[in-house]
UniProtKB/Swiss-Prot annotation:
Residues 393-395 are annotated as: PDZ binding. It catalyses: Self-cleaves 52-Val-|-Asn-53, 62-Ala-|-Phe-63 and 74-Val-|-Thr-75 at the N-terminus of SpoIVB. InterPro entries: PDZ, PDZ_6, PDZ_sf, Peptidase_S1_PA, Peptidase_S55, SpoIVB. It comes from Bacillus subtilis (strain 168). The keyword 4Fe-4S does not apply. It is found in: Forespore intermembrane space. This is SpoIVB peptidase. The zymogen is inhibited from undergoing autoactivation by BofC. The protease is inactivated by proteolytic cleavage. Residues 29-52 form a propeptide. GO terms for biological process: proteolysis; sporulation resulting in formation of a cellular spore. Residues 1-28 form the signal peptide. The active site is at H236, D363, S378.
Length: 426
């Protein structure tokens, strides 16, 4: 074998052996974050077994550092930012930019709530054929209106509820004039015209559309921020039962509800909380937002769950770990209880996303009573290591013991609680 080839092979073998020996340290080095966020008075740990020193890059008042054998603990002291510098044998090897944010705590929920939503305008949920003198017709369908469209104006007048519609239809029908409609379809606004037809059976004019201006259901309160009274619930969007499209909210309200029974979930057939609430019940908060991360608004007064009424810290998605956790929810009457779960997997997210973790119900009593995650449990707060980390959102249809959760970070943002305010301003 030529000498130059022998040297090349030897070099390759040497590099390979070194790579194997350095594999774990290299992985741990790469796992050290380049940026991290921590709240004032709270501590975050960076897991590493590397023999490195860690210290602030300057006489910083933003945070303190403590090195343990297998982790580096960073504790926020004062909002601001600084750098954490790692050195090996006196040589700097990496830096982490640390953002210390103003302290934030929320009161976890768990209460069963009744939800009443009022849409912007009236929602078209379907069509029907009118028996006219010329046969069956649907003027709305002929005009190009689609299920899921929202009628927001008729003849230039704002439409807010179903009762607003009938006078315009009857007037246009009697005069034989067309109705000028302004409809909202997704993000578009579309103008169209239609002429009401007389129903031969009833003698009234119709437009051949099924419409709705409100929706109701139940869910679970996730949290509220005690200073602003802003809250978040459900953890997922509310969609219309017929069109399956998200309801565009004009306003709405939440009330207390009572769980009367549970339909237990089985494989392929998710269960459900059966609950009741009366329209006469006192409104406990308003709804001003219906988003992929839940419903949001402001409470009219503080509400208690009588199990964890003290404000708790919140966790960033990077802090959530695989392992034991708890949820707060109601399975009987209005009593909030704590149940054991397991975080099976979690995804540290840089941008808002609805499915941030997979969880599994492990509590024997909850499994016995419900079979796992059931409809109406959406929004149940998840607590891990004394912090609110997220909310239950979806159940796996073929395995009701498991489902998805959303990180609390994104629900707080949707609620209008700017946890990054000082960070953005710096």
């Amino acid at each position: 074998m030529p000498d130059n080839i022998r040297k090349a092979v030897g070099l390759i073998l040497l590099v390979s052996l070194l790579s194997v020996g350095l594999c774990k340290p290299l992985k741990e080095y790469l796992l050290i974050p380049t940026q991290m966020r921590v709240f004032e008075t709270q501590t975050q740990a960076i897991e590493t077994s590397l023999s490195v020193n860690a210290q602030t890059s300057e006489s910083s008042e933003a945070f303190t550092v403590k090195k343990d054998p297998h982790e580096i603990k960073v504790t926020g002291k004062k909002s601001g930012e600084s750098e954490l510098v790692y050195d090996l044998a006196g040589f700097p090897i990496k830096k982490t930019k640390v953002h210390v944010l103003p302290d934030l705590k929320v009161i976890p929920g768990g209460q069963s709530i009744g939800v009443k939503l009022h849409s912007v305008g009236v929602l078209v949920v379907g069509f029907h054929q009118i028996n006219t003198s010329e046969g069956k017709k649907s003027p709305g369908e002929t005009a190009g209106i689609e299920a899921g469209d929202i009628i927001i104006e008729m003849n230039g007048q704002k439409i807010e509820k179903m009762n607003d519609v009938a006078p315009f239809i009857q007037k246009a029908g009697k005069t034989g004039e067309s109705l000028d409609l302004l409809i909202k379809r997704d993000k578009q606004k579309i103008k169209t015209k239609l002429i009401p037809e007389k129903d031969e059976g009833e003698g009234k004019y119709r437009i051949g559309l099924y419409i709705r201006d409100s929706a109701a259901g139940i869910g679970t309160m996730t949290f509220y921020e005690p200073k602003t009274k802003k809250y978040g619930a459900l953890g997922h969007v509310i969609s219309d039962m017929d069109t399956k499209k998200p309801i565009v909210v004009e306003n709405g309200e939440i009330v207390k509800s009572t769980v009367t029974s549970i339909e237990k979930g089985t494989g392929g057939n998710p269960g459900e909380k059966l609950a009741r609430f009366s329209s006469e019940r006192k409104t406990i908060g308003d709804i001003n937002r219906n988003s992929p991360f839940g419903i949001f608004g402001t409470l009219h007064q503080p509400i208690q769950n009588n199990i964890s009424d003290q404000a708790l810290p919140v966790a960033f998605s990077t802090e959530v770990k695989k392992g034991p956790a708890e949820i707060l929810t109601v399975i009987d009457d209005d009593k909030v209880e704590k149940f054991d779960i397991e975080i099976v997997s979690t995804t540290p997210q840089k941008f808002p996303a609805t499915k941030g973790m997979v969880l599994k119900i492990t509590d024997p009593r909850l499994l016995k009573e419900t079979g796992g995650i059931v409809q109406g449990m959406s929004g149940s707060p998840i607590i891990q290591n004394g912090k609110v980390i997220g909310a239950v959102t979806h159940v796996f249809v073929n395995d009701p013991t498991s489902g998805y959760g959303v990180h609390i970070e994104w629900m707080l943002s949707e609620a209008g609680i700017d946890i990054y305010g000082k960070e953005k301003a710096s």
